[in-house]
C-alpha cells in the first residue's frame, strides 16, 4: 500500500442544512452520531460512524443549495460497499430515498445503485461480486 496508507478514514461534507443532512445520513442511512465538536471559530462539526474506523464529517453553514453537477471538477461521488445490494435497495426505498440510478451490473463486474443526498451529492452503493475487476487487479498486482 502506498506510503502505508491503510484506509480512507472519513469524508467531509459542507452542507447548508445540518438537520436535513442528519435526517438523511443518521436517520435514514443509519450512520450513528459519534460526536460533536466545536472548532476554534465556533463552527460545529458532527461525526457520523460508517464503520468502526470510517466516518463522515458534517460541516454546517455551507453556501449554495446543491452539489456540483457530474461534469464539474470536484469530488464526483462516494461509494459505500454493502454485502447485499437488494437489501440495501429495500432499506433505501423503505426510508423514502429515491433510487437515482437503478441496480445494474457495472463495468467492473459489481452490482451498483445510486442515490443523491438532500444536497445532491451522489452516493453509489456497491456489492462486490466474485471475479470482479478489482479482485483480478489485486491478484495481478500481488503476483508481480
Where in the sequence are the language-model features?
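Vicinal oxygen chelate
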Residues: 1-8, 32-79, 89-116, 129-144
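Short glycine-/small-residue motifs
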Residues: 125
Amino acid at each position: 500500500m502506498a506510503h502505508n496508507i491503510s484506509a480512507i478514514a472519513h469524508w467531509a461534507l459542507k452542507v447548508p442544512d445540518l438537520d436535513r443532512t442528519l435526517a438523511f445520513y443518521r436517520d435514514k442511512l443509519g450512520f450513528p452520531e459519534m460526536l460533536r465538536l466545536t472548532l476554534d471559530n465556533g463552527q460545529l462539526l458532527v461525526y457520523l460512524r460508517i464503520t468502526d474506523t470510517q466516518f463522515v464529517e458534517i460541516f454546517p453553514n455551507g453556501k449554495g443549495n446543491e452539489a456540483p453537477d457530474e461534469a464539474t471538477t470536484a469530488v464526483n461521488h462516494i461509494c459505500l460497499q454493502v454485502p447485499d445490494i437488494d437489501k440495501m435497495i429495500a432499506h433505501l426505498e423503505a426510508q423514502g430515498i429515491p433510487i437515482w440510478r437503478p441496480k445494474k451490473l457495472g463495468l467492473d463486474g459489481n452490482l451498483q445503485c445510486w442515490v443523491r443526498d438532500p444536497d445532491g451529492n451522489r452516493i453509489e452503493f456497491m456489492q462486490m461480486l466474485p471475479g470482479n475487476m478489482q479482485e483480478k487487479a489485486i491478484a495481478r498486482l500481488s503476483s508481480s
